[in-house]
Every structure is written in C-alpha cells, then in structure tokens.
C-alpha cells in the first residue's frame, strides 16, 4: 500500500469513527424498551433501602425520576472506567449504547411525578458556607432538583450515605477499583475534609426531592 493509499485509508477510517461516535451520541432512548431491559437494575435499585457493601456499606442511589442524560453519562463513565466500581462496571459493559439510552429514558419517567418547591430549606450557616465554597447550586440548581444541565444529577432527597460515598469517590484517585475521575467534580471535592463532605451530604439528603426508589418485581 503506497503513501497516498495509507493516508486515504486513515482518513476514511477516521470518518467512520467520527460517524459511529456521532450516531452513539445522537441515540434516542425508548422508555418502553428500557422497561424490558431493566432486570439487572431492579435487583438493587428496585428494592427500597437496598445496601451495597463496596467500598463500604451505603444505600444504592434512587434513580427513578433522575435526569436521563445524567443516568446515561454515569453508565458510560462506568463502562469506560472513568467511574471505578467493579459491580457497576460489569453491568455497564454488558450494555450497548442503545440499551443505556433506553434504560435512561425509562428511569427518567419511572415513578410518581412530584412537585417540589423552588425554595430550598435554609441550611445552617456552616453548610451554606460549604455549598457557596464549591458553587454547588451553580450547576445543581438553587433547590438541587433542577440542575442547570440535564447531564447533571438531581441531588435533593438522595440517600445521604450514597451522596457521601459519591463525594468521597471524587477525592479518590489512586485506587484501581474505586473512585471517579471527573475533572470538574474532582476539583470541586478536593478542598473539603471528609467531615465537611458529610455535612453537605446530610443537608442535600434532607431536602424534599423528586428522586424515588420504587419497588419493582423481577416477575412480570
């Protein structure tokens, strides 16, 4: 193969890669299809109060009524290894991009729609200062139910122990099986002590929220 042919081959290959990536990004989720694919999900997220045990004991997150774009981004991060968690990586790697889009669409509309007041419960001053320090409301919204971007998560009413382990995971960079490598959140979480992260998690978890853990049966 001569130089011209090699360059042409490389160019065409790059076009195919870009096209495939664009198609994956542009997938439309089908909630009805997602309902048929959620058997693995309900084994943990369909049991109210279900607890994970790695890297410590905590309740698995509520995902019903969560933003579809956030669920999609989270699953892709587990699949790529950006988020390090053995169980979730195994689950995510078994899913195609279409599966991820469908499941995300399903859980966004799953559960009962709840109307939450725009104004949040005023935090204690020490917590307010911590939230201001990180600019948390700037991305996650003033009431922590209406993020500025749909790829950001709703936080209000999420399990406190999950929020705490999630925040800690952004500080954990040296562990091969635990941690999250998101540059923005890692930078935000780094300046806080663990005690301060706990205060933030406890406050956010105490807020009225739209997120739900809805009991689901594997038997349909």
Language-model features, listed with the residues they occupy:
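Gly/Gly-Pro-rich "capping" loops immediately C-terminal to redox-active cysteine motifs
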Residues: 31, 35, 48-78, 89-94, ...
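Residue-level hotspots at or immediately adjacent to binding/recognition sites across diverse folds
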Residues: 25, 47, 91, 142, ...
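Bacterial N-terminal signal peptides
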Residues: 9-19
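Sequence/structural segment immediately N-terminal to covalent heme-attachment motifs in c-type
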Residues: 26-51, 119-144, 159, 216-220
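C-terminal capping alpha-helices of c-type cytochrome domains
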Residues: 93-115, 188-217
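Inter-heme linker and motif-flanking segments adjacent to c-type heme-binding CXXCH motifs
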Residues: 48-54, 81-84, 109-125, 137, ...
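Bacterial N-terminal signal peptides that target proteins for export
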Residues: 1-10
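Intrinsic, low-complexity N-terminal interaction/targeting segments
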Residues: 39-42, 102, 118-119, 168, ...
């Amino acid at each position: 193969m001569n130089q011209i042919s090699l360059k042409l081959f490389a160019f065409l290959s790059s076009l195919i890669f870009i096209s495939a990536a664009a198609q994956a990004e542009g997938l439309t989720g089908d909630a009805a299809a997602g309902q048929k694919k959620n058997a693995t999900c309900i084994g943990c997220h369909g049991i109210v109060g279900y607890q994970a045990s790695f890297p410590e004991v905590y309740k698995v997150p509520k995902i019903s009524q969560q933003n579809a774009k956030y669920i999609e981004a989270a699953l892709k991060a587990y699949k790529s290894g950006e988020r390090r968690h053995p169980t979730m990586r195994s689950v995510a790697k078994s899913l195609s991009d279409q599966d991820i889009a469908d499941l995300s669409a399903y859980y966004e509309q799953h559960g009962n729609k709840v109307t939450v007041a725009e104004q949040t419960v005023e935090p204690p001053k020490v917590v307010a200062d911590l939230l201001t320090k990180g600019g948390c409301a700037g991305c996650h919204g003033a009431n922590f139910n209406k993020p500025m971007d749909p790829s950001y998560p709703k936080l209000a009413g999420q399990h406190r122990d999950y929020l705490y382990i999630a925040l800690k995971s952004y500080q954990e960079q040296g562990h091969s099986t635990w941690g999250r490598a998101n540059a923005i959140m890692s930078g935000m979480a780094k300046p806080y002590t663990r005690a301060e992260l706990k205060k933030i998690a406890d406050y956010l978890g105490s807020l009225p929220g739209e997120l739900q853990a809805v009991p689901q049966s594997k038997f349909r």
